[in-house]
Amino acid sequence: MATATVPFFDSNDRLFDQGKAFWNNYLKGRPSAPDAFFQRLFNYHQSHGGQFGTVHDVGAGNGPYAHILRSKFQHVIISDIAKENVVLAEDRLGVDGFSYRAARVEEGDDIAPGSVDMVFATNVLHFCDQPLAMSEIARQLRPGGTFACAAFGAAQFEDPRIQDVYTRINHSGGRALLAKADDPEKLVAVMARTQGKYNVAPLDEGLFRPRAQRIHLNMENGGITAPLPPEVQVHEPVYTGVDDVETFVQEDGWSFVTGLEGVKEHVLSFPFARDDPNFGELWQEMEEIIGDDEVKGTWPAKIILATRR
């Protein structure tokens, strides 16, 4: 496989380089993936002949899922683009069965070819150069190894009034991000990949077995809410392959009940809200709708599972 230079994405790289306070709120404001999520990944991996030696948790942030991976694998490599996030992960998890590296998903020269049993990429692949990232992931995986990609995080609220304000908060935050982005075109592509069905991961048929699974959970109401403003035009390729198997499932374990404070924790788990000058006005609208009422909703999610040839 050819070696390529990984572009520096400037402000995009720094979106989740936010420090300990942000990550503490992130852990409260984002969904806790149910046991069924990880069981699906582990069952797929085992049924396709995968081993449970080394898993590489790429774009891991501060490693919120690394301890679950460690419960099945002998060794977990935790990588993130932000060095501070890696330090936070090591402070919490220690070194028994864990190793750490600060690097992009596209960078892996320090990892031996064919040495990884699973690459676990959750809530990160939309940031990447798609062909470069998938080429590097394939290089690391041993034959029969699993590429496990997932995205979840944006809520889908039952009350359409709450969902409307939430969507407008996302779009307003997206405009604020684009206004200060070093490369707005790249950031638009990132936002577009996140939206709806989570459009990532081109799977080279020479590197991955056919019939990869692209599983859409709880997307009956439109999929994942993203910060891409509706007035922005984007032309991103569709990365689902002709031999990929797409399924749409309503799955238990992804619903939530919370209140106004829980909604605020969730909104502030995204890095654009605090810096958006319109956030205060939009949040006041949210407060007026919710008041002291309970808020119900669901977490849409996307899972991609593929096996290395």
Curated annotation (Swiss-Prot):
GO molecular function, one term: S-adenosylmethionine-dependent methyltransferase activity
Usage in biotechnology: Secalonic acids show unprecedented anticancer activities against various human cancer cells and might be interesting for further derivatization, targeting diseases such as cancer.
Functional pathway: Secondary metabolite biosynthesis
The protein's Enzyme Commission number: 2.1.1.-
Stretches for region Methyltransferase domain: 57-149
Cross-referenced CDD domains: AdoMet_MTases
Pfam family membership, one: Methyltransf_11
Key words of the record: Methyltransferase, S-adenosyl-L-methionine, Transferase
Keyword check for Transferase: yes
Domain of life: Eukaryota
Gene Ontology biological process terms, A to Z: methylation
Keyword check for rRNA processing: no
Function in brief: Methyltransferase; part of the gene cluster that mediates the biosynthesis of the tetrahydroxanthone dimer secalonic acid D. The pathway begins with the synthesis of atrochrysone thioester by the polyketide synthase AacuL. The atrochrysone carboxyl ACP thioesterase AacuM then breaks the thioester bond and releases the atrochrysone carboxylic acid from AacuL. Atrochrysone carboxylic acid is decarboxylated by the decarboxylase AacuI, and oxidized by the anthrone oxygenase AacuG to yield emodin. Emodin is then reduced to emodin hydroquinone by a yet unidentified oxidoreductase.
Similarity field: Belongs to the methyltransferase superfamily.
Protein name: Methyltransferase AacuQ
Organism per entry: Aspergillus aculeatus (strain ATCC 16872 / CBS 172.66 / WB 5094)
